[in-house]
């Protein structure tokens, strides 16, 4: 493979929990390893963006990939793209990025997932992220890679999770027996076997043809990733419905409640948890309605325990159960969830920072990393991560067109 000099890349990520922010991170990478970690930030959206995105999410659920897209998609996509473009411009113009004189070669723009449908035996998968890569490239004058998931879905994959490729690069420096658990709206797990070469041109291995049983994957698979189940989304929605708050801050409500173990056992009988990976979920695949009839505190406790127990079930299907989980994403800041993971997985639970990683920046770093892989023509999804039949080079590259720069600039 021709040598590729590492470049600076910006990654942008907004999660399905709609916290009103965009994560922005800079890394220097060749798409296989990370040479340097640059600055990162959490940039709040202007007023009005979050409610508009919520309208788009609500419209997406009613649309369900049937018929024309809801009109609110175009409005929300333009507003989100301009808001994130303005955030990137401010980020690059401020210290330390400006002080270091960093000029990115590419931006990885994930956009906002409004609907995701995993493929089933009788139905093709589908996915929709709001984000206009061509508009962002024109506004910033920097190449932009967006629409990372569609190519995988068209090829028969789940379209998620895509973070495995980057997690594998991070795991190269971790102790054996470590897996990565990301806790956003949905949880996802990345496991790399002892023969995993990491994300080179074809590093993560092809899924083995045989399995020991319907609940286990082949031990010769080098890289496995899948969604474990719900994470923060149901409990966040539960708290918002009952208090107007955005989340169970510090797990205070869950800590004050009692888990309904009988209900939890019923929830864990859902067929998703016995299906072999690769598999993926939409943010609304499991909802706060699972706790209906419980008190505020008991509902929070039960939904939190469900998220942790789902991870425990996920570990059961791996070829080798990991000794420890490096946890990234917002869920690692919830002490009740972290304690529940320790209780219900049997693994050592460590925040990503204990491994020297930046837990709040990992998802944004991931899309910077994937953007560089797209530039190089390297795959970003694999049979063991999304179930796609063969590795797929995903993402759409948009090059700047100064003549097409909108006169209104960053204004909505």
Pin down the residues of each PLM region:
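Short beta-strand-loop/turn "lid" adjacent to the catalytic site in phosphate-handling enzymes
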Residues: 63-131
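Intrinsically disordered, low-complexity terminal tails and inter-domain linkers enriched
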Residues: 96-103, 193-221, 407
């Amino acid at each position: 493979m021709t040598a590729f000099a590492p470049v600076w890349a910006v990654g942008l990520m907004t999660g399905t929990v709609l916290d009103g922010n965009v994560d922005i991170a800079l890394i220097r990478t060749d798409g296989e390893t990370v040479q340097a970690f640059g600055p990162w930030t959490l940039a709040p959206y202007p007023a009005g963006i979050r409610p508009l995105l919520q309208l788009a999410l609500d419209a997406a659920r009613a649309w369900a990939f049937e018929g024309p897209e809801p009109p609110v998609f175009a409005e929300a996509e333009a507003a989100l793209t301009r808001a994130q473009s303005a955030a990137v411009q401010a980020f690059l113009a401020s210290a330390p990025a400006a002080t270091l004189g960093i000029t990115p070669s590419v931006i990885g723009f994930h956009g906002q997932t409004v609907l995701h449908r995993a493929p089933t035996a009788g139905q093709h998968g589908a996915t929709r992220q709001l984000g206009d890569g061509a508009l962002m490239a024109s506004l910033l004058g920097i190449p932009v890679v967006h629409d990372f998931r569609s190519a995988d879905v068209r090829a028969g994959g789940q379209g998620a999770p895509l973070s495995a490729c980057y997690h594998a690069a991070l795991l190269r420096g971790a102790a054996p027996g470590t897996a990565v658990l990301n806790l956003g709206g949905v949880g996802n797990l990345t496991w790399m076997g002892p023969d995993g070469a990491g994300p080179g041109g074809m590093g993560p291995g092809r899924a083995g043809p045989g399995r020991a049983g319907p609940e286990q994957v082949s031990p010769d698979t080098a890289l496995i990733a899948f969604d474990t189940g719900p994470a923060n989304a149901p409990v966040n929605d539960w708290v918002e419905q009952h208090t107007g708050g955005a989340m169970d801050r510090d797990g205070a409500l869950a800590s004050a409640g009692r888990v309904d173990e009988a209900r939890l056992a019923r929830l864990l009988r859902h067929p998703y948890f016995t299906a072999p990976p690769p598999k993926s979920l939409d943010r609304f695949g499991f909802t706060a309605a699972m706790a209906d009839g419980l008190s505020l505190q008991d509902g929070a406790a039960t939904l939190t325990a469900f998220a942790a127990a789902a991870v425990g079930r996920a570990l059961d299907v791996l070829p080798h159960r990991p000794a420890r989980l490096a946890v990234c994403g917002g869920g690692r800041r919830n002490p009740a969830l972290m304690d529940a993971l320790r209780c219900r997985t049997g693994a050592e639970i460590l925040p990503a920072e204990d491994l020297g990683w930046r837990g709040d920046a990992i998802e944004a770093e991931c899309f910077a990393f994937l953007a560089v892989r797209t530039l190089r023509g390297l795959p970003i999804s694999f049979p063991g991560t999304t179930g796609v039949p063969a590795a797929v080079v995903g993402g759409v590259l948009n090059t700047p067109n100064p003549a097409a720069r909108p006169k209104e600039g960053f204004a909505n």
